[in-house]
C-alpha cells in the first residue's frame, strides 16, 4: 500500500458513518483527538526504537504513518502539500533550511 492510497482511503472515511469505521470514528472526534492519538503512537515508536525491537518498531512505525495521515486529514492538510514541502527542501542543506525558518522573538 502506498501513502497516497492510504490517504485516499482516510479521506473517504471523513464522510463515512463513525459506527462503520475506526478511521471515521477517530476523524469525527476532531483534530485534537487525532493529534493526541498521533502523539501516543509516536511515543510508542520511540520506545520500541530505544529498546531495539525491530519488529515492534515496524508495527509502531506503521501506526505512526497511519495516524499522521489521519491527523493531516482532520486538519484539512493534503498529503500532496507535505510531499511538495519535502521536495522543496530536498536541495537545501538541513542546516541552511533550519536557519531560514521563522523564529519567534
Swiss-Prot record:
<dbReference type="GO" id="GO:0005737">
    <property type="term" value="C:cytoplasm"/>
</dbReference>
<keyword id="KW-0547">Nucleotide-binding</keyword>
<protein>
    <recommendedName>
        <fullName>Phosphoribosyl-ATP pyrophosphatase</fullName>
        <ecNumber>3.6.1.31</ecNumber>
    </recommendedName>
</protein>
<keyword id="KW-0067">ATP-binding</keyword>
<dbReference type="GO" id="GO:0004636">
    <property type="term" value="F:phosphoribosyl-ATP diphosphatase activity"/>
</dbReference>
<keyword id="KW-0963">Cytoplasm</keyword>
<dbReference type="InterPro" id="IPR008179">
    <property type="entry name" value="HisE"/>
</dbReference>
<keyword id="KW-0368">Histidine biosynthesis</keyword>
<dbReference type="InterPro" id="IPR021130">
    <property type="entry name" value="PRib-ATP_PPHydrolase-like"/>
</dbReference>
<comment type="pathway">
    <text>Amino-acid biosynthesis; L-histidine biosynthesis; L-histidine from 5-phospho-alpha-D-ribose 1-diphosphate: step 2/9.</text>
</comment>
<dbReference type="GO" id="GO:0000105">
    <property type="term" value="P:L-histidine biosynthetic process"/>
</dbReference>
<keyword id="KW-0378">Hydrolase</keyword>
<keyword id="KW-0028">Amino-acid biosynthesis</keyword>
<dbReference type="Pfam" id="PF01503">
    <property type="entry name" value="PRA-PH"/>
</dbReference>
<dbReference type="GO" id="GO:0005524">
    <property type="term" value="F:ATP binding"/>
</dbReference>
<comment type="similarity">
    <text>Belongs to the PRA-PH family.</text>
</comment>
